[in-house]
Amino acid sequence: EEFIAPPLDPYKEALEGINELQRQQQKLDPKPFVFKLSEILRIYVQNRFNMPAMELTGEEFIIESVSNPFFQNYEDLLREFVDRGDRVKYSKETADTNETNLLLDSALHFVKDSHSRITDQESTDSQNQKTHSE
């Protein structure tokens, strides 16, 4: 009898990933840190919004996200996250902890905020369905 773990909630998975990364922040170089953070954010978007986020370039990721009305509030945040992240990942300069903290905060804010908006939306939807069915 093989035990198959239920798929993790994308939100919990993202939060756990970010918390885990926060714990390793001192040990990791900025580049691998940002690669991992970016991956967590994209996996969250991919699983939560059925968007092939892992296969997209930074620019495609922005265009794709922003085409979804839900993401329009986050355009600046995501664009900045991708731009800063790419600078850390691909430039020769070494990012300082300030920079990685900013990226971490942005990712965390995006995950928490989008999650609470979805949850609000879902509870509004289910209340609307109740009202209609009576």
Model-derived segments and their meaning:
Residues E1-D29, R117-E134:
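Hydrophobic, helix-length membrane anchors
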Residues I4, L8, K27-F35, M51-E55, ...:
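Conserved phosphate/pyrophosphate-binding and hydrolysis machinery centered on Walker-type P-loop NTPases
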Residues P10, G17, I40, F81-R84, ...:
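Amphipathic, well-ordered alpha-helical segments in soluble domains
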Residues Q22-Q25, V66, K89:
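A structural signal for long alpha-helical coiled-coils and helix-turn connectors
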Residues P32-R84:
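Short, charged amphipathic alpha-helical segments flanked by flexible coils
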